[in-house]
Amino acid sequence: MSTYAPFAKPLYVMLKPVGAVCNLACDYCYYLEKSKLYRDNPKHVMSEELLEKFIEEYINSQTMPQVLFTWHGGETLMRPLSFYKRAMELQRKYANGRTIDNCIQTNGTLLTDEWCRFFKENNWLVGVSIDGPQEFHDEYRKNKQGKPSFVKVMQGINLLKKHGVESVSYTHLTLPTTPYV
């Protein structure tokens, strides 16, 4: 007999393990000024202690047998792979028979074979931010030195494909890009 209420709805929370930390400086980003809020700790990232506390409490608060962890940024891949491996260890520790799923949003520029193997082996859904064709994407999504990022993003997308990682795209729509949707 299930211990979950038949009318219960899942609780969804977005984790931001890097806060506003990012390797890009997109024109429309609402996080660019956030680092000024954390002058004493500009890297304002989630500690391992907070990670464990959050995972335990988030799983225990669920009223459904499936738990979804959504990792968002800043740029989520600015945290080392070891951080996410630890997160999965903690998810297993506190799962209590629940199914745990993970999805992560990235700008794609830091994807490597190692990251993609991890995502594939652990069945993560990866969202990649790409703002349409190169001429539109590069107009808005530049690195901190003002250089365009489209080529790096496409390299990341190709790595996801190479490794068979399930992925989706996130696109910031503007009037000129809507015909491409």
Can you say where each PLM-predicted feature lies in the sequence?
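Long amphipathic N-terminal alpha/beta scaffold segment
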Residues: 2-4
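Canonical Radical SAM [4Fe-4S] cluster-binding loop centered on the CxxxCxxC motif
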Residues: 7-49
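Short glycine-centered, acidic/aromatic-flanked micro-motifs in structured strand/loop junctions
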Residues: 17, 73-74, 106
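Residues that scaffold the ATP/ADP-binding catalytic core of kinase and kinase-like folds
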Residues: 25, 29, 114, 139-140, ...
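Radical SAM/AdoMet-radical enzyme domain recognition
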Residues: 55-70, 79-173
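Single conserved hydrophobic/aromatic residue that forms the stacking wall/gate
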Residues: 172-181
